């Protein structure tokens, strides 16, 4: 997980999964890595992980990405498309000030390198279990935005990695009960 920098344009100080917008470069990367430029969102996930926390998803592992050329390990051993399982997609409701269409991917890994925050978008980066993150949120130690909260809640319910990789989270907008039950910070950026 990352904690966004306090000067981040959207949800500063919130804890989130590494990620960001699909850039123009992602379709060509998707063509190169996955054989299909329509997989630009999947390529963006790989690129953002390397840029924000210096982790490169390769064919066999998740490795430390070099500061200079963080995608070099990916170019050398591209991951197959199925290595990154799409588990959720969240689209911002119209009332959200910053529009997003966020796709969440999971990747299997054994003994991955430690994440290193880039300092520009990620102030902090660390490995944490979904249940521990929800406990930190309940203790008001971290801020979670609703797509992250809903995704982490679904991940915490998985019994094992196989169940997690078969997961397809129902994407929806928060209902009235949730709007009233959760702290305001889950739904609205007040900072």
Where do the PLM segments sit?
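Nudix hydrolase/Nudix homology domain
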Residues: 15, 24, 28, 66-191
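Conserved Nudix-box catalytic region and its N-terminal flanking loop in Nudix hydrolases
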Residues: 1-72, 131-135, 139-143
């Amino acid at each position: 997980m990352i904690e966004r920098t306090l000067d981040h344009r959207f949800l500063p100080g919130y804890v989130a999964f590494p990620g960001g917008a699909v850039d123009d470069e992602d379709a060509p990367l998707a063509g190169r890595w996955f054989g299909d430029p329509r997989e630009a969102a999947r390529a963006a996930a790989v690129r953002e992980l390397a840029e924000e926390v210096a982790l490169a998803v390769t064919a066999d592992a998740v490795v430390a990405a070099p500061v200079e050329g963080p995608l070099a390990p990916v170019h050398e051993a591209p991951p197959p498309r199925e290595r990154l399982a799409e588990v959720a997609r969240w689209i911002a409701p119209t009332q959200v000030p910053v529009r997003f269409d966020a796709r969440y991917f999971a990747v299997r890994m054994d003994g991955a390198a430690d994440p290193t925050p880039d300092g520009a978008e990620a102030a902090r980066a660390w490995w944490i279990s979904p249940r521990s993150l929800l406990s930190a949120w309940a203790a008001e130690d971290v801020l979670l935005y609703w797509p992250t909260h809903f995704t982490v809640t679904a991940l915490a319910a998985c019994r094992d990695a196989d169940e997690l990789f078969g997961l397809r989270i129902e994407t929806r907008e928060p209902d009235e009960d949730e709007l009233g039950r959760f702290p305001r910070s889950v739904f609205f950026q007040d900072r």
